[in-house]
Design a protein with these regions (language model features):
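DNA major-groove recognition helix of helix-turn-helix/homeodomain DNA-binding modules
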Residues: 50-65
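Conserved hydrophobic/aromatic packing and binding residues within compact polymer-binding modules
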Residues: 12, 26-27, 37-40, 66
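Recognition helix of helix-turn-helix/homeodomain-like DNA-binding domains
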Residues: 31-47
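Short basic helix-loop element that most often maps to the first helix and adjoining turn
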Residues: 10-29, 54
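Short, charged recognition helix plus adjacent turn
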Residues: 57, 67-80
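A detector for short, charged/polar N-terminal pre-domain segments
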Residues: 1-7, 75-77
Length: 80
């Protein structure tokens, strides 16, 4: 079972790809470096709860889209 961070990373990568954006495009929208986006998408950088609103705005998706595939227990632990 993948952990929540891996699920969010996969969903961020999928949303970016769906828009045909390069990592640099998402980085510019977030005010992040390309390396931060790459590390986030590859699970090398944990996505903090504070990052979620910015990711949702940049990708123009609701939080539920980034959490799609998460286990109920993970969401309960986050109090979502």
């Amino acid at each position: 079972m993948p952990d929540l961070a891996a699920i969010v990373a996969r969903n961020v990568r999928a949303e970016r790809a769906r828009r045909s954006w390069r990592q640099v495009d998402l980085a510019e929208k977030l005010g992040w470096s390309i390396g931060m986006v790459s590390e986030t998408e590859n699970g090398k950088r944990r996505i903090g709860i504070a990052d979620m609103p910015n990711l949702c705005r940049a990708l123009d998706v609701p939080l539920t889209d980034l959490l799609q595939g998460a286990e109920r227990e993970d969401l309960i632990a986050l109090k979502l």
